[in-house]
């Protein structure tokens, strides 16, 4: 019986350690190295392995990594524990990192108004320029700079709490590049620049891509460093069969894996303990399975506990000294310098960042300022470092400017007011002035329309703009029949001062042409107006389609045909569109939408306030109101309040309950303006798709009238 027990124990031991080098002998006081392979999201398995090593107190003397292995390995070498890295992984939205979408709250005021395109195609030298990747990696810079701030002053990676190296591939020569010195964030960016997903990274005079192209499993490099025992985490799953190759990423992965499979076999000769987690059904982009992947690494590492227990132990509990987060990493920035800028000067760059010199900054505050600069869309990528120069702290910015000036842009949209529309746009940057932009939209579909916008952005110094638009639309009665058809053309010239890209104040003059037709009697009417106006605008909403926080304000005072009327005849209007978004919980947001419009001596039907319809375009004095047809009711004055309770689930899905109340009235002479004459309830199901919003709404007036079913697809234009 005893012999049988020994036999089965030995058999289990052999089965468990088939990934352990044959005849492995552990010398006295061995040096232990950790080799972490690349594999995108599969690299989260490394974290599970690190947690096991930490729980046993294993002393690691050197770390090498490629791609995601470089990211995890770099964090570990910098003093983070396995649990620390697990927390980082679980709290990071990797899809958001890859999307590299601008933070809308920081986007320039002009760009917020033209945020409506699905496809953007740069034109250079008369030719279409295809993007080199999905993302430039700008958000990766923010994240890595923040994570590695405690070792940002260490240029020699052998001086880190655990010596470290990472592998990248020189894009021009195809040769392996081993990074052991320099900016650790930049080196890791180069090692993880997966082709087609992220732009190549320029360091010095060379450009680099993912190290997996040459050595994905850098075990041999550790042996060359004198490491006795190399513990490796192998993420290679071999080549896929045709039934598993279903996307561009799958095809690219398969091609890259041709070389990885061969090189990994070579690296196994230098790996003493090869930990190979079970990653069946998981791939480089399985970021939503990070918990499962992390657990697979932890489970696999537990099989090697008996061997790990024979290895040297740490004589300390932590590698990083705990730091008070309130006072940590605060730098006095005395000056700034910019490298590689040929189009935009230092003053423009510092101004857009709103950087005051000298001032105290953290890596987090610098990241936020760079986000403002990046949101101008004038730069492909912006890197930075804090350096010492003449006993001063200097913020060194290295920029890669977007030299493209011409763009073609396209969009699609459907709503119940303007029906279907295909948007084609031409955008020209730096026309006459470096800080200028011209945008020309043509909408082709059921209701053709055009928009022209030219603006010189001088920040808080007033800039000049020209705007023009033209459109046609039908007004409907409560029986859903069109009773009027309008053509409206507007041309504006204005000056505008912008503060922090959140507020704009200015004034101008507009020229309106109206052509209206009564579809019942056939009567036609045409009027023209020259109107001076002033305005105050604000926009800090985090999303145009499904905002969760921030506000929107548009307050305008306009005098109609001011230059043609006597003082007694002059007509004025004051209107305010005010919206606020207030997060109640992580998933629930209260959204307030209010509109106030007042008329003095108004005599034109074209400038009355019209209530009804679901739309978000700027259409004269038409006001959105659920449960009523577009332009169903009108009068000289209006008060409306919309209350939305927006519930967000499964990241991009929404359910919105709405209660709207309002009033239209002729004057303020009696108490009628305090009455609620219009009210409705509505329910919306929405999806924030890569192609814009998808909304299905059912709204019902609280009066005795039929409900209205509406569909909205795509960005508003």
Residues covered by each model-derived region:
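Bacterial Sec-dependent N-terminal signal peptides
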Residues: 1-25
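Short glycine-rich beta-strand segments
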Residues: 469-473, 510-514, 556-562, 597-601, ...
